[in-house]
Amino acid sequence: MMAEMFRIAGQNIRIAGGSICRLLSGFEVPAENQTDTDVCRVSLTEGYTQFDISSVTPDHPVEHVFSIHSCPGHFMVSDGDYTNSTALVVKPREEGVMELFLAALYSHMAGRARTVFVHASLVEMPGQGGVMFVGRSGIGKTTQARLWEQFRGAEIINGDKVFLTLDEDGRGVTAHGSPWCGSSPYKLNRATPLRGIVVLDQAPENSIRRLSEHEIMTQYVSHIFLPMWDARLTDCVMEAIGGMMPLVPVLRLSCRPDQEAVDMTWSAVFGETAQ
């Protein structure tokens, strides 16, 4: 079975089988840079007519079984540390297969790479770092990203889903684009030092303030995807969150969709007076 390698948030993932790999376009690893070390492997088998765990014979042990409730007929079995997974699909749907890929990758990374996955948009200011906008669906994450593009020349890395990793020295946080972008068209394969996290709220007047530790837990952490299927991985993600929080300011922006909101946030994150 032909396998393709991709690199997402610093993690290699090798996927074999299925045409769905086109959805990961832009995250391919060139042949000359591929490696077989520290690789998450997923094989995709389409056309299952019945799911019977006893009949599944992958070339790896089976300790975990996943199903996608929103996409019936999409299943996955994984070994103990999620290094090897086999996706079993009755009739492939793009969102279902991508959810399986995400479950395999996030499970593999959460226990190793001090990684969290956030419902957020991400912009990068060249030479300065990134700003991440967090909030419920429809609150204006992509709108804020576009305003930063318009008024500050920022580049939009992703409009909906972002990986964060704690740097090896524990002194910084890196934000990574991902192939998962929701309904937005933005999904660059780019990483940037994270300078600020902005929790969004719509309001008739613009204001911004730094959140307390308690507010961070209630207003920001609720937008982080926790791997609730595995208690150990959930503990790893919570530990990563705890390591990241002292390193990056978490702000609450109550705002209109205008330039003043951009300038106000710029000053709060980068410590400069907006010009």
Residue map of PLM features:
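Hydrophobic positions on the alpha1 helix immediately C-terminal to the Walker A/P-loop
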Residues: 144
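A noncatalytic interaction/capping subdomain that flanks phosphate/NTP-handling catalytic cores
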Residues: 1-137, 147-157, 162-275
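Conserved lysine of the Walker
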Residues: 141
